[in-house]
Swiss-Prot record:
Listed name of the protein: Interferon gamma
Biological role stated in the UniProt entry: Type II interferon produced by immune cells such as T-cells and NK cells that plays crucial roles in antimicrobial, antiviral, and antitumor responses by activating effector immune cells and enhancing antigen presentation. Primarily signals through the JAK-STAT pathway after interaction with its receptor IFNGR1 to affect gene regulation. Upon IFNG binding, IFNGR1 intracellular domain opens out to allow association of downstream signaling components JAK2, JAK1 and STAT1, leading to STAT1 activation, nuclear translocation and transcription of IFNG-regulated genes.
Assembly notes: Homodimer. Interacts with IFNGR1 (via extracellular domain); this interaction promotes IFNGR1 dimerization.
Record localization: Secreted
Residues with the Pyrrolidone carboxylic acid modification: 24
Family: Belongs to the type II (or gamma) interferon family.
Glycan-modified residues: 39, 106
Superkingdom per UniProt: Eukaryota
UniProt keyword terms in alphabetical order: Antiviral defense, Cytokine, Glycoprotein, Growth regulation, Pyrrolidone carboxylic acid, Secreted, Signal
Leader sequence residues: 1-23
Length: 166
């Protein structure tokens, strides 16, 4: 747990960006509170390397980066959920969650609810597994780039048109 907490401050800064606003100062103070609570500045936390920083470096394209960031944000929401009964750090976690919510989900409460639903889905439940497999084709179709499909259809129509005119 200590190892994970060390990177909370570092990665939230990288993940969420920097800003000079008043609220951002409070955000950094709350991260410092969490670092202190988890003793995350202790040198032993660095053993084994960072959790997310090295992975984030590998994702350069902005749209690709969003994919990995969603997994990292999911991790932090799970971490905060596991610590929700800890009154000592509750305020800090609430402020950080709110900032994360604003930056990652653009303040959309509907997106937040959907995101929470997704991270709560138990992968070891047989009924859930069956439903997931049943929806797999639709999910894969949604993942396919629609613009390529349109381009392909357009080029097929052009090719057919040329063929008919010759």
């Amino acid at each position: 747990m200590k190892y994970t907490s060390y990177f909370l401050a570092l990665l939230l800064c990288v993940l969420l960006g920097f800003s000079g606003s008043y609220g951002q100062g409070q955000f950094f103070r709350e991260i410092e509170n969490l670092k202190e609570y988890f003793n995350a500045s202790n040198p032993d936390v660095a053993k084994g390397g960072p959790l997310f920083s090295e992975i984030l470096k590998n994702w350069k394209d902005e749209s690709d980066k969003k994919i990995i960031q969603s997994q990292i944000v999911s991790f932090y929401f799970k971490l905060f959920e596991n610590l929700k009964d800890n009154q000592i750090i509750q305020r800090s976690m609430d402020i950080i969650k709110q900032d994360m919510f604003q930056k990652f989900l653009n303040g959309s409460s509907e997106k937040l609810e959907d995101f929470k639903k997704l991270i709560q889905i138990p992968v070891d439940d047989l009924q859930t597994q069956r439903k997931a497999i049943n929806e797999l084709i639709k999910v894969m179709n949604d993942l396919s780039p629609k613009s390529n499909l349109r381009k392909r259809k357009r080029s097929q129509n052009l090719f057919r048109g040329r063929r008919a005119s010759t």
